[in-house]
């Protein structure tokens, strides 16, 4: 019965799911991102028609990031990180004002922090160019790993398909000739 129910959909349902539908898909914003979704994140690929397939070399080609795009993404992430640190600092200052009397009583127990440690904390470990190079290398390594996994899966599937073909051929031969011994003439 469930099979029959899925075959008898109304035309209204298909109208809602068609690409020409007046309804648009929404993109859920990622945590920590601005409330308005960026068009880059919401880009929906057009549905491919049946029978059209892209070769493996073209699948990853349109998703490659140029070094300029990687650098721009890193800069955006760095500005978000700086804003987050500023907000955390402002929040900590508000808490510090409320807990001032507790800190005054505990200050005699703890050693004062040296001003040199604060400057060292703010210095970046890598330059922006180095971070870009690291990101490119990580992306390339990840892509290579995915390609290797894909090749392994394809080889396994091919071996399974070949094994089933051999079994099928053997069964066909056994049906046709039965238990008779094979001869070169037949």
Curated annotation (Swiss-Prot):
Chief place where the protein resides: nucleus
PANTHER family: AKIRIN-1 (PTHR13293:SF9), AKIRIN-RELATED (PTHR13293)
Subcellular location: Nucleus
Annotated region described as Disordered, given as residue ranges: 14-65
Sequence motif SYVS motif, location on chain: 183-186
Function noted in UniProt: Molecular adapter that acts as a bridge between proteins, and which is involved skeletal muscle development. Functions as a signal transducer for MSTN during skeletal muscle regeneration and myogenesis.
Gene, per the UniProt record: akirin1-a
One annotated GO biological process: myoblast migration involved in skeletal muscle regeneration
Compositional bias per record (Low complexity), positions renumbered to this chain: 49-60
Record has Nucleus as a keyword: yes
GO cellular component: chromatin; nucleus
GO molecular function: transcription coregulator activity
Keyword Hydrolase set for record: no
Protein name: Akirin-1A
Entry similarity comment: Belongs to the akirin family.
Keyword vocabulary terms for this entry: Nucleus
